[in-house]
Amino acid sequence: MRIVVKVGTSTLTHENGKLNLEIMEKLVRQIANLSNKGEEVILVTSGAIGAGMGKLNLTEKPKNLPQKQALAAIGQGLLIEIYEKFFNEYGKITAQLLLTREDFSDRKRYLNMSYTLSNLLKWGVIPVINENDTVAVEEIKIGDNDTLAALVASLVEADLLIILTDIDGLFDKDPRIYKDAKVIEVVEEFSDDLFKIAGGAGTKRGTGGMYTKIQAAKICYNSGVKMVIANGKIDNVLNRIAAGEKIGTTFLPMKNPISSRKIWIAFNAKVNGFLFVDEGAAKALVKHGKSLLPSGIVKTEGQYDVGDCVAVVDHQGREIARGLVNYSSEEVEKIKGCKTHDIESILGYKYYDEVIHRDNLVVLERGEKYGG
């Protein structure tokens, strides 16, 4: 079994921001045990900024990016040094990977990363992954390690993603407000209600709240990866989950997951523009799996070239699909709303009948509201 384990800052650190070495050692022991049983394990770890905070005795995470990056630069070396020391005690070799959004959005780098991780796992090495917080600016930030872990799980076609946090799972309502709140044991399908009850920001030392974990579950759902959210301080939690024990909240994957190439289009490729479509075109895409023709496009936004990824937005302002375009933004501006047989007379040439062919288009399971 191939398992990705994500552990968050709030689990890895004390209240004062310093690393909780006891928790880290227990985590490493469990991962080493899984590896010794023949499981392939990847660790996605937060904690670099928290480690930097502890080193400087800071108790509040700074808001501005340069200070966060400076703390990450201080903390990342300390974090990996501790992991390496603990894993060495169990005879395990680690490999550090620091990633940015560009490593996922660039198709060649994405595939190369897949080959690298496959080789490390084949050699019995434990890859330790974090976002490269020191260099990531807003344009290339993944933003949170819940999403990073889901993207990695999707990339390596993992069987299971375990997200360890400081709460017991996804509750049916906010447990900080409602004393009768209960953990949802199994989620089989996605609905807007999951995002509504997921809440917002994380803790003082962390980035991802429950909302980001639901977004991660959405990626896993479409990728065919089972995901579990559980409390990282439960005794032997990783081995128990891997053995099938019901702990926390389990998100089941869809029965017919999207192909790996379409997963890349849906969740990894950089969105360079937006195509706004009428009701008929939206129905053709979502209900009937058709290609997007120019006749259904009412507006285009952004600058994009042939082969770039764009988001498709319906008449209600919801993002319903993503796909790779056959025409540039300048060309789409000229042919939007026209029939396919008019493309050549308008442009002087015709590459394709479709602006996005259905083979290069992914309908999203849940439409996010367009924010442009």
Curated annotation (Swiss-Prot):
GO cellular component: cytosol
Protein name in UniProt: Glutamate 5-kinase
GO MF terms held by the record: ATP binding; glutamate 5-kinase activity; RNA binding
SMART domains named in the record: PUA (SM00359)
Function as written in the Swiss-Prot or TrEMBL entry: Catalyzes the transfer of a phosphate group to glutamate to form L-glutamate 5-phosphate.
Annotated pathway: Amino-acid biosynthesis; L-proline biosynthesis; L-glutamate 5-semialdehyde from L-glutamate: step 1/2
Enzyme Commission number(s): 2.7.2.11
Keyword annotations from UniProtKB, A to Z: Amino-acid biosynthesis, ATP-binding, Cytoplasm, Kinase, Nucleotide-binding, Proline biosynthesis, Transferase
Top-rank lineage group of the source organism: Bacteria
SUPFAM superfamilies per UniProt: Carbamate kinase-like, PUA domain-like
Reaction catalysis annotation: L-glutamate + ATP = L-glutamyl 5-phosphate + ADP
GO biological process: L-proline biosynthetic process
Chief localization: cytoplasm
Residues that, per the record, bind ATP: K6, T165, D166, T207, G208, G209, M210, Y211, T212, K213
Gene giving rise to this polypeptide: proB
Matches recorded under PROSITE patterns: GLUTAMATE_5_KINASE, PUA
First-level EC class: transferase
